[in-house]
Amino acid sequence: MDPLALLRKAGLEAEGPALPLHGGDISRVWRVGRFVVKTAQDPPPGLFRAEARGLQALAERGVRVPRVHWVGEEGLVLAYLEPGPEDWEGLARTLAALHRRREGSYLAEPGFLGTFPLPGREGGEWTAFFYERCVLPLLEATWDRLQGLGPKVEALYQRPLPAEGPAPLHGDLWHGNVYFAREGPALLDPSFFVGERGVDLAMMRLFGGFPRRFWEVYGELYPVPEEVERALPRYQVYYLLAHVHFFGQGYLGALWRAISAS
């Protein structure tokens, strides 16, 4: 949908032209004055509502995110955050505080990783929760493209994953979903659920982009136990299956390396 038409549907007044912004592989994104408008070509039902719920969940837990002005099946209208200087130490403080929070139980509403639908799930033992809610749907979707790696992926989760306690997660925390606003570090495009912080740490490590100073400050504020470090490749398998699904078999090498390191 045209961004100006979406603003009209939302009952919001455009304050200037629609200027394209980088929107990644899923959405088309524009700045229109004080608003950011996101749309997508034939989005799966519930995509933008899930994003809005995730932003609200992070905001309720003290994370800076763009305010949601309107959400519908066609798109999402957010507040535009003025850019500011990089503040990796501030980001480390934000994420350490988020990951230190303890929730009542593991919990995921039906949602998405990118545009891939994920089921809801609540409670239970962590390894089963993570495997059945996150890994298994992607494993089933990519099985025929894994060149025999499927059984090796299954075997990874027959050993328990370490459990520090249920914590709120961004859920898709690569460096492109970090935004340094004038007011301080902000997070974008969450795939929010309550799980173990190793999931976020694994995605941050997978594609890099987080400098040494970030990791130093995060580690000072919330040290990462050795058993969590050792589990990161098993969490990375989740994201690499998603990359095989979206982008093809070029990611099988990285998937094999994560399996081998597990």
Curated annotation (Swiss-Prot):
Any one GO molecular function term: kinase activity
Lineage of the species this protein comes from: Bacteria, Thermotogati, Deinococcota, Deinococci, Thermales
UniProt keyword list: ATP-binding, Kinase, Nucleotide-binding, Transferase
UniProt family annotation: Belongs to the fructosamine kinase family.
Catalytic activity: N(6)-(D-ribulosyl)-L-lysine + ATP = N(6)-(3-O-phospho-D-ribulosyl)-L-lysine + ADP + H(+); N(6)-(D-erythrulosyl)-L-lysine + ATP = N(6)-(3-O-phospho-D-erythrulosyl)-L-lysine + ADP + H(+); N(6)-D-ribulosyl-L-lysyl-[protein] + ATP = N(6)-(3-O-phospho-D-ribulosyl)-L-lysyl-[protein] + ADP + H(+); N(6)-(D-erythrulosyl)-L-lysyl-[protein] + ATP = N(6)-(3-O-phospho-D-erythrulosyl)-L-lysyl-[protein] + ADP + H(+)
InterPro entries from the UniProt entry: Fructo-/Ketosamine-3-kinase, Kinase-like_dom_sf
A Pfam family reported for this protein in Swiss-Prot or TrEMBL: Fructosamin_kin
Protein EC: 2.7.1.-
Binding site for ATP: 79-81
This protein's record includes keyword ATP-binding: yes
Entry keyword annotation includes Methyltransferase: no
Catalytic-site annotation from UniProt: 172 (proton acceptor)
Designated name of the protein: Probable ketoamine kinase TTHA1179
Its biological purpose: Ketoamine kinase that phosphorylates ketoamines, such as erythruloselysine and ribuloselysine, on the third carbon of the sugar moiety to generate ketoamine 3-phosphate. Has higher activity on free lysine (erythruloselysine and ribuloselysine), than on ribuloselysine and erythruloselysine residues on glycated proteins.
